[in-house]
Amino acid sequence: MNELELLGPRAYGDALGRAALKATAEDFQVDEVLDIPLSGDGEHLWLWVEKRGLNTVEAARRLARAAGVQLRTVSYAGLKDRQALTRQWFSIQLPGKADPDLSAAQDATLQILKSGRHKRKLQRGAHAANGFTLRLTQLEGDKEALNQRLETIALQGIPNYFGVQRFGYQGGNLGEARDYAGRKALPEQRAVRSRLLSTARSYLFNRVLAARVADGSWQKAQVGDLLAFTDSRSFFPADVDECSDPRLAILDLHPTGPQWGEGPSPAGGATAALENAIANDESVLRDWLVRAGMEHERRILRLPIGRLTWHYPEPDILQLEFVLPPGCFATVLVRELVDLVPVGQTDSPCVF
């Protein structure tokens, strides 16, 4: 499957040119934003780690080996890309133990920048945001048009699609999910099961969002919508009054789409009709998610791009700096600007 089939239409028209992303790790930098002050004592050693050419799980394994502990005692807030320069937190549970010598874990691909003790382990999804610095190289495009589109995006946001990396190479993860769903089976391995269930939910969400981008309603509240704030997992129904809430205009409040689970869509009106129609069209995937015990959740349809700035350090390089909530994909911003020339892979996303 191609990108258009896995995601959906762009919000602002065709790509404005071509560029390469991830020609080097420095072209895709991610800094985890964590608003948790460390207590200075406790059985958990927290580590601020810079890594390149390593995904999060590989880094965790290396830290576990160096510390002489089992992998399950190493925790992290979210998964970060392999083909990137990333800085994120890890914690290691060390009850009654001194800080281990972790020099064996460090080399040109992994450096521990700072450390500290805390009373609790690092929980999945505990980070507040991810900060990105992207360099689009080999740029071919009209800078004036790119600047205008970036200004529009800064004011209006972008569709909050799950990026193609969620679906694997050419949508292979979705093919696997369909195979298991068709057999009414679940993978035995927990990691594989989680990956394929997430893929199926993401695809159903993207289909709903694609339909709303196509009809122009992705950033507008309509009666029957379920609304949510940018950083909240809770939601509430939209009536006539809520549809004119001024917080919609300033990108604090957004319509949401389904993360499918048990029961019909909790939305109402035209929103429920659309979501249930897509779920019925993909009934094999929907029923598979329900049998797996997934709970119905919501995800904002519109993604505000925090602190968006850009400049051109070289005539053929566009550098973007911005902040996204956890679970959102930097590559969907790039997609609204340019087509990518194949260079590096967008491996594993920031999914938590």
Curated annotation (Swiss-Prot):
Reactions that this protein is recorded to catalyse: uridine(13) in tRNA = pseudouridine(13) in tRNA
GO CC list: cytosol
Pfam family, one: TruD
Active-site residue list: 81
Domain called TRUD: residue spans: 157-303
Molecular functions (GO terms): RNA binding; tRNA pseudouridine(13) synthase activity
PANTHER family to which the protein is assigned, alphabetical: TRNA PSEUDOURIDINE SYNTHASE D (PTHR47811:SF1)
Role: Responsible for synthesis of pseudouridine from uracil-13 in transfer RNAs.
Family of this protein: Belongs to the pseudouridine synthase TruD family.
Protein name in UniProt: tRNA pseudouridine synthase D
Lineage, uppermost ranks: Bacteria, Pseudomonadati, Pseudomonadota, Gammaproteobacteria, Pseudomonadales
Gene it is expressed from: truD
